[in-house]
């Protein structure tokens, strides 16, 4: 039979051997590729870090400069115009036409280039004084004003006939006063007395005579009404 206490020192000896034993060395890391240097940002290289190929001329000569290439397109330059040789001078530019002489309406900025093509002599016609749209020539197209219509005698604005002063004129005033009383009975006011030559004395005398006549007629009318009322009361008082 084995002693159980004999296993304990063996296990302890194995644990001590594991602690004292060194681990195996790690494998070296894989080699990394070499880093490419960053290209310097220069105006002669494009975005792909590739140098531009040297441009050669069409006939195999040295590369043309930028100014020569610009001149070769249409032969345009500071001394040559489009389609002209180097020896010919460019034609002068047409100057814009100025405003036509004389007063005229204001031109807007949008209509400026359109109206500049017109002849300066064909400026807008300025309307003369008194002319209106649709009526050229001022008062030439308008007919003269029509005279007012004459008033008839019934409206009361007709011509007034002057009556001579004296007894004949007074008789005429009396007849007019009688006619005025008849008009009062019908509901129309009496016509005003006509003036006599613009003299205040004659006018006052005619007005006074008319007032006297109207007062007499009024008294007669009142007296007749009173007589009729008395007769009416008498008829009512008498038995039938």
UniProtKB/Swiss-Prot annotation:
Biased segments, Pro residues type: 22-37, 89-104
Organism field: Human papillomavirus type 5b
Region of interest called Disordered, as start-end residue ranges on this chain: 1-204
Regions of compositional bias (Basic and acidic residues) in chain numbering: 67-76, 167-176
Chief location category: host cell
Domain of life: Viruses
UniProt similarity note: Belongs to the papillomaviridae E4 protein family.
Name of protein: Protein E4
Gene behind the chain: E4
Keywords: Early protein, Host cytoplasm, Host G2/M cell cycle arrest by virus, Host nucleus, Host-virus interaction, Modulation of host cell cycle by virus, Phosphoprotein
Post-translational modification: Phosphorylated by host ERK. The phosphorylation triggers a structural change that enhances keratin binding and protein stability.
Biological process terms in GO annotation: symbiont-mediated arrest of host cell cycle during G2/M transition
Localization: Host cytoplasm; Host nucleus
GO CC list: host cell cytoplasm; host cell nucleus
Subunit relationships: Assembles into oligomeric complexes. Interacts with host CDK1. Interacts with host SRPK1; this interaction may favor expression of late viral transcripts. Interacts with host cytokeratin components KRT8 and KRT18.
Function statement: Contributes to multiple aspects of the viral life cycle including viral genome amplification, suppression of suprabasal cell differentiation and egress of newly formed virions. Induces host cell cycle arrest at the G2 phase by associating with and preventing the nuclear entry of host CDK1/cyclin B1 complexes. Inhibits cellular DNA replication by preventing loading of host replication licensing proteins MCM2 and MCM7 onto chromatin. Within the cytoplasm, associates with host kinase SRPK1, a splicing factor regulator, and inhibits its activity.
Keyword Cytoplasm assigned: no
Other notes: The major E4 form is first synthesized as an E1^E4 fusion protein from spliced E1^E4 transcripts, such that the first few amino acids of the E4 protein are derived from the N terminus of E1.
